[in-house]
Amino acid sequence: EQPMAAAIGADLPINEPVGNMVIDIGGGTTETAVISLGGIVALGAVRVGSFDIDAAIQAHVRREHGLAIGERTAEEIKKSIGSAMPTPRERDAEVRGRDLVSGLPKTVILTPQEIREAIDEVVTQMVDSVVRCLAVAPPELSQDFLTRGMYLVGGGSMLRGLAQRIERDTKVPVNMSPQPLEAVVLGAGHCVENFSALRGMFMDSRR
């Protein structure tokens, strides 16, 4: 499963008797897994990801500014001024698209605050999924989460302020993977190279 591969890619001690919590935010899903002794002991998933953030930005710009923009422009807005929480030195962004009334090119100014509000519903669904997974995790692993923190991977994890938002709402420290985009791929590659040794773990990753 992807969370297991992400945990391996993040070099977490998945075979040790400690709780490892991984949050993998991809394009269409957010998966949260608690891994201990080589198995997944709690798993949560919700069908929202970074693509849904882009769609929310598109819908907001269309509804509030009468402007049609493409997926690539929405992604650029997310990267330039999108955030899950207020951040230092925020700046407005100039965005170009097609006026829905005249059909002509049009430029509007977007603020970080309005984009934050536009994507808040999606971000909240992501965070709530993490909260639910924490709630069903074995209680004896709670101390591990508090001392070692959770690990955030996946392209969607790069949204500014998301780690801080999860930490605020769960009261559990959040660590960003040094290679959030590559964690799953690195883990999958390690699994292929060591398939014989890891086969049993993946055959029974849900305990």
Briefly describe each language-model feature range:
Residues 70, 89, 190-207:
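Acidic, glycine/GT-rich loop-and beta-edge segments that sit at the periphery of enzyme/chaperone cores
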Residues 3, 118-146, 191-194:
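Phosphate/ATP-binding catalytic cores across multiple sugar-kinase/actin-like superfamilies
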Residues 1-23, 189-193:
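Conserved phosphate-binding catalytic cores of ATP/NTP-utilizing and phosphoryl-transfer enzymes
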Residues 86, 142-166:
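Glycine-rich phosphate-binding loops at beta-strand->alpha-helix junctions
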